[in-house]
Amino acid sequence: MTNVPVADGVGATEAGVLAANTAAGTGASPLIGDDDRRTGRRRALAVLSLAFVVYLLMSIGLWWHVWSTHPTTVTTCGCGDPAFFLWFLAWPAHALSHGQNLFYSTLLFHPNGVNMLSNTSELLLGVPLAPVTLLFGPIATLNTASTLAPALSALAMFWLLRRWVRWTPAAFIGGLVYGFSPFMVTAVATDHLMLAFLALPPLIVGCVDELIVRQRRRPIAVGAALGVLVTAQYLVSTEVLAIMVLIGLVALLLLVGYAFLSDRQDLIRRLPHATRGLGAGAVVALVLLAYPLWFTFAGPAHLSGLVWPTLTPGTGGLTPSAIWHVHYSTADTRAFHVLGGYLGSPLPTSEYLGLGLLVVLGLGLLVWRRDRRLWLFGALGAITVVLSLGVDRTYWVPWRVLAHVPLIQNILPSRFMLVTTLCVAVMLAIIVDRARQSAGDVVRGAAGRWSARLGPALAGALGSLVGLGVAAVATVPLATGLIGKVPLTVQTVRLPLWFADAAPRLPPGQVVLTYPFIPSGIQAPMAWPAVDSLHFAIVGGGGPGGVV
C-alpha cells in the first residue's frame, strides 16, 4: 500500500509514518528495538494521562459548585430532564443488586412498565457507575457522569488527532473544542448525557480510518473493536449512533468516489482489507446487539412509530445566524424556571461556533487546499449543518424527505451539530498544526542563511507562537460566549416532606401516584423515588410517548 504525502492531505511520508509510530509506541520496524517501542508507549501514555488530567480539571471547574459543596445532594436541579436522568441512572444499580432485567422495569409507568432501550436510559453509563450509585446515591452518579463526559470526550478526540497532526498542542486544542464546545456545555448543563458523552464517536472514526486509509493493523481485530464500539454507542444513545451511521455512509461515499476518480488501482488494493474489517465489525455488532435490538423493537413496553407524537418530525432545527452570532437558549431556561426552579443563566445555543472559528476554518481550507482531510471534514461539517436546519424553513431542506423516513424521523435535527463539532475540531487541529509547520519552515529558511544553530530553535518558537495565535483567534469567541455562565449553577435536590419522611417506611412493592402527575416536561417527581433507592413504583413517567 502506498503512502500519500502530507502535502496532498492524507497520511504521511514514510519517514513521517515511522516517526509517528515511534512517538505513539505503535507500528513495527526492524530498525526499532523493543526497548524503543516500550519507551514510545510509555511516553504516549504519559501524554494521554497529562491531557486527561487537564481536561478533567477543566470539567471540575465547569461543575465547581457541585464539587466544592455537596456532590451527593446538589446538581443542576431536581427538575425536568435532570430528574428524568436521575431515575434512569439509579435503575442499573437497582437492577444489578436485585437480579432484575436491565432492559425493563415496572417501577416507572406502572403497571405497564418502561422499555429502557426505547428510552434515553444511557445504560452503558449507569452500569459501570453502579458502585457510585449504591454507595453515594444517584445524584453523585449524575454529577460524576456529567463531569467525566466532557473530559473523556475531549481525551478521545485528542487520541484521534494525535494520529493526524504532529504537534501535540494542536491535538489538545482540537480535543478542547470538541469536549467543551457550546454543544457539549449545553448538553451537560441540562444533563443530556446521551449527547454529552461523546467519547465513542472519535474512537469509531479512528477504527474506520485504520480500516480504510491507514491499513497497518489486522483488519479482523480492528473490525472487532469497531463492532464493540458500535454496540457501546447503541447502549449510550441510539440517536447518536444513527447520526454517526448516516454521516459515516456519506463519508464513505465521498472517499470511495474520490478514490475512484483519482486512483482506481489504489482503491482496488485497499478494498479487500477494508471489506474484511468492516465485515468483521458488522458481524460483531450484530451478534452483540441481536438481543438488545429485539428488545428495542419487540420487547415489553417497546415503542413504535413517532416516539415524540406531539412533535412534528423534522422540527427543532437550528437558527443559521446562531452559528456565528451567540444566541442564548432563553426558552429552555424559562421552562426550567417554571417547572423546576432552575436558577442558572441562559447558555449559548448548541450550534454556536463563533465568527473567529469560521474565519480560521475558511482561510485554512483556502491556504492548505491540497489537504484532502480538510475537504472531507469540511464537506461533512457543511452537510451536517444543512441537516441541522429542520423542516421549519421557507426553502427546501433535506428534512422535507427525512421527516417521512421511519426511525430517522425520530432524530431531532439540531443534534446533527454533534458531528459538525467533531468535524470542526478535526479541521482546527489540522490547520493549527499546518500553520505552525509553515511558519516554522519560513523562519527556518530565513534564519538558516546566517545561523544554522539558531535557525531551528527560532523556527520552533515562532512557529509555535503562530500556531497558538491561530488557535486563539478561533477559540476566544467560543469562550466569550460562556463568560458569566460557568461554573454552572446548581441547587440542592429537595424532596417533599412526605417523600423524605414517610415514603422510605413504605413496605416494598408499593405504588405511588404523585402530584403533580408526570407528563413529559414535569418530571420532578421522578427524582423522588430515585433518591429513595427506587423503594417504590410510580404511576406514569417522563420521556418518549410513542405507541406502546
Named regions from a protein language model:
Residues 1-65, 274-282, 457-468:
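Start-transfer (signal-anchor) and selected internal transmembrane alpha helices
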Residues 55, 147-164, 169-260, 277-293, ...:
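Membrane-embedded helix bundles of polyisoprenyl
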Residues 58-153, 179-188, 192-198, 202, ...:
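Membrane-interface coil-to-helix junctions
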Residues 75-78, 187-195, 312, 338-349, ...:
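Membrane-helix boundary/interfacial segments in multi-pass membrane proteins
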Residues 261-278, 361-397, 445, 449, ...:
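Membrane-interface helix-loop-helix junctions at transmembrane boundaries of multi-pass membrane enzymes
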Residues 279-283, 426, 432-479:
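Signature aromatic-anchored transmembrane alpha helix within multi-pass, membrane-resident enzymes
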Residues 460-546:
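Extracytoplasmic
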